[in-house]
Amino acid sequence: MMSEPKRLHPVAVILNLCHTIIQTIKNIILPFFFVYIVNSNHTVRFYGAIALGVLFIWLVAASIIKWRRFTYRIEDDEFRIEEGLFVTKKRYISIDRIQTMNTSAGLVQQIFKLVKLQIETAGGGKEAEAVLSAISVEEAERIKEAVFKKKAQRRENELDEERLEAEEELDPSVEVQEHYRMNAKELLMAASTSGGIGVIISAVFALISQLDEVLPMDWLFDKFSFLQHASIGIYAVLIFIGLFIAWIFSIAGMMFRYANFQIIKKEQELVISRGIIEKHQVTIPLRKIQAIKIKENIIRQLFGFVTVSIVSAGGGDREKEEGALTILFPMIHKKKLPHMLRTFTPEYTLEENCRRLPRRALKRYLFRSVIFSLFLIIPLCIFFQPWGYLSVILLPIELLFGYLAYKEAAWTINGDRLQLTSRFIGRTTAIVLKKRMQVCKFSQSYFQKKGRLYTISTSVKSSSHMEELTVRDVGEEDAAFILKWYSYEKADG
């Protein structure tokens, strides 16, 4: 009976303990540990060891108490959770507010054949409303079935279409319509061009800065003091080796993250799964999709590959590597993209023939590309001669990016579908349906008014905020056409 209070699997004690230890290490233990190791006073070491032992025992006891006091049940059309170490906290989540329930399995869960269930609600923000960290696969399916059944019962008096959708969610025998699995070439391309090298380098510098505060680093500097007299060539080689190692680590991380990536389309929903060490699975109803975003960085564009994301209202992948987005295709060739969108998101198809910006918008793109750099370049050229003149190299590079941004900015309308393309460093194409647009804004600055240009932006609802899609400096006549298209729908509505 789902109305009876239930506890998590005892493995939740291990998960709670690991999480608490990691948080404690971040906040307390790391500096204490290094001070304890460096300090040669035996009395300090003795009491330090006792303190560590007492703290560990307390963390184990707290994890067991938390597990014992955590219960969940479904009662009176609510998902009820009671938890707390000393004070009992009660959370009642209305079944109507539950949008999606996603499962994932880390290394510990996989060993014991368990899953983590995340319950997400409308307007729940970036974090899941409730998390059951260790339950059996069968229990997760029972919870999903019970929730979907209650939602279906409460919607019996609504439109037939909504009732059918609820029945499809409930029906476990729905046949798989389409299936896609990312191949090895796409996985390698996604990993090697992900830009994760920046994250690795930032993490290394952050770690070094933390170690420098608690450990004397003079001995390390002494060992590498010979580099003070090294040539520029040696420095260049060392920097290259460091960047190459960071790049290899970023590739490995991305390959573990997106290995076994696959999409299964079942009637009116997409089931997306990925991962080796930690497996993730999310379910997105097609009716929750608000927009599709197609992104290309410079390297991927050269090879003809793109990344496709979904903006959804509720649900999605909570890791937020793309902000409020869920990855639909981590890496796919542009030639395959139109067919794949028609297959998995038939309402959101890609248009090849788009309307470009007028010629008079070019100077605005070129001006915006260099204006902020000029405030840096001019002082460098004046006060840091002659090396400051090297900063002038930035100008042609930025002008090139400004020209590309102008050249690739575009829009098109096909029926009730609006497609916007813009570029900053990488190129982004957004596809949105008229009925999903929360607002459509047409703004015009003083200088845009002189050039008869407008900035067009529209917002769609995502799980945590409003996602804005924008194209700058659209011609006045084009802006009027888009406004008429959007206003016509509102008048009909």
UniProtKB/Swiss-Prot annotation:
Coiled coil: none annotated. Keywords: Cell membrane, Membrane, Transmembrane, Transmembrane helix. GO terms for cellular component: plasma membrane. InterPro entries: UCP026631, YdbS-like_PH. It is a multi-pass membrane protein. The chain crosses the membrane at residues 18-38, 46-66, 188-208, 232-252, 370-390, 393-413. It is found in: Cell membrane. It comes from the Bacteria. The keyword Cell membrane applies. Its main location: membrane. Belongs to the UPF0699 family. This is UPF0699 transmembrane protein YdbT. It comes from Bacillus subtilis (strain 168).
